[in-house]
Amino acid sequence: MNFIGKFLGLIIGWKLGGFFGAICGVILGHLGDKKLYELGTVNSSFFKSKITRQSLFMQTTFAVLGHLSKAKGRVTEDDIQLASHLMQQMQLDDANRRLAQEAFTRGKAADFPLRQVIREFRLGCGQRADLLRMFLHVQVQAAFADAQLDQSEKDVLYIVGEELGLSRFQFEQMLAMEFAARQFSRAGYQQQNRYQRDYGYQQHQQQYGGYQQQSGPTVDDAYKVLGVSATDDQQTVKRAYRRLMNENHPDKLVAKGLPKEMLEMAKEKTQQIQSAYDLICKTKGWK
């Protein structure tokens, strides 16, 4: 991130108000640096223009969603409704909605350059791991949303994960964590029985040792959300919880380029992490 704002704030603040003025100057400069980074432009050969990091995140999200939908052979009405629902959830204005729709349509093309688009996205985000994880979180949740995870969808997600720097093992682990996290959301409660009945998801179950039908999240789900095991001690679990909360902090993600329209999704992620941690503590009798 740019440090020029903090530097100028320090100098000007010191001259105008001495020590305390310098402190105020650094704080204001830091806020300025965050805004400059957020609004800074990046190059995109696919989107044919210099765009802000937030616009790059939004357009890449919908382009890959379009490609993911087409991977099954044809784009269904459910896929279109899912994309429309996401646009509504993000409260996109008319201009950004048009950009999102155009990106979704371009993503459906047979010659969509998936690897190139993801590489440019990764560079545009400054290779910030937390921001890249949030992007992948959106794609995985979208793939789960139609109550099945086809092999063709997994193949697309594998490529996305690979280009974002994840190994196959790390990606499989993330899939397990993301499914477990759904149990702590309202959408997870509503759809989990549909997942259990679906053949495509049954294959996914077998890969992870199987999920039992349930009326709500279990402590095993909570362990998967935090990426810990039942044998880990309180300090290990707390450390994993704090790391995930820090990585997924909504305000920090927005400052690093996450569109403000996706703030609610980031908040839901932290709520899932918090709920999982609370359930573990309750089960273990930890305070």
Swiss-Prot record:
Domain of life where this protein originates: Bacteria
Example of a GO MF term: protein-folding chaperone binding
Location within or outside the cell: Cell inner membrane
Main location: membrane
Transmembrane segments: 7-30
Protein name: Co-chaperone protein DjlA
Gene Ontology CC entries for this record: plasma membrane
InterPro entries registered for this protein in UniProt: DjlA, DjlA_DnaK_co-chaperone, DjlA_N, DnaJ_domain, J_dom_sf, TerB-like
Entry note about domains: The transmembrane domain is a dimerization domain.
Subunit-structure text: Homodimer.
Recorded name of the encoding gene: djlA
Boundaries of every J domain copy: 221-287
Organism expressing this protein natively: Pasteurella multocida (strain Pm70)
Cytoplasmic topological domain residue ranges: 31-287
Keyword Translocase: no
UniProt KW keywords: Cell inner membrane, Cell membrane, Chaperone, Membrane, Transmembrane, Transmembrane helix
